[in-house]
Amino acid sequence: MSKYKNVFIDLDDTLYDFKGASMESFKETYDLLEYNRYFNSFEQYIELYTPRNLQLWEQYGRGEITKSELNRIRYSYPLEAVGVQDEQLAARFCKEALSRIPTKNKLIPGCKELLEYLYPKYNLYILSNGFQELQEHKMQTTGIRDYFKALILSDHIGINKPRRELFEYALNSTGSTASNSIMVGDMFETDIAGAANAGIDQIFFNIKGSENLPFAPTYRVTSLKDIIGIL
């Protein structure tokens, strides 16, 4: 019998195919706003956007920039990189893209099967750094909201993964303990290292095939169905 009673799960790119939904939404918005006036291709836009976006999310996670600054800078940057100074256009891209993403019914393969297996056996909670207005919508769109007792969102609480305080909040607010809980996520730095720092066991969903990890997680899987063999 498993020692765990509570399973905290990251949403984006762990259960929800955020990358796929984002690319589809970005392409629609790119075409709608005729960004081909400024970029050689959609791929050029994404190549400019992606690394800067990752940097900004790291800053946001450390509390160095606000949510509004994150959105303003990351959507302005690709335009500025090709010599276009137009914050209004960048803001429209942001609004259009973010409104489209949660309407995409995209789940990581094996998601529904995993949740069907876990639901009768454990208390399930989402623990996410994603924006509050998007996460609930994504879960309703994909039909997975009812599997979860609660959504614990850093955007609502004001503390981001990997900070220990967020994991402690998650435990305290759900009546869980570190010893009877486990965290599932695809981001080593935020999900896995953060949980470990709070004394919580972890399942690293290594969907990207990362190697040379800073430390060995409690468990490591490359597909969601593998989690069934652990829990």
Where are these predicted regions, by residue range?
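N-terminal helical cap/lid subdomain that shapes the substrate entry/recognition surface
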Residues: 2-108
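Asp-based, Mg2+/Mn2+-dependent phosphohydrolase catalytic module
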Residues: 1-7, 20, 112, 116, ...
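Glycine-centered short loops/turns at secondary-structure junctions
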Residues: 121-122, 199
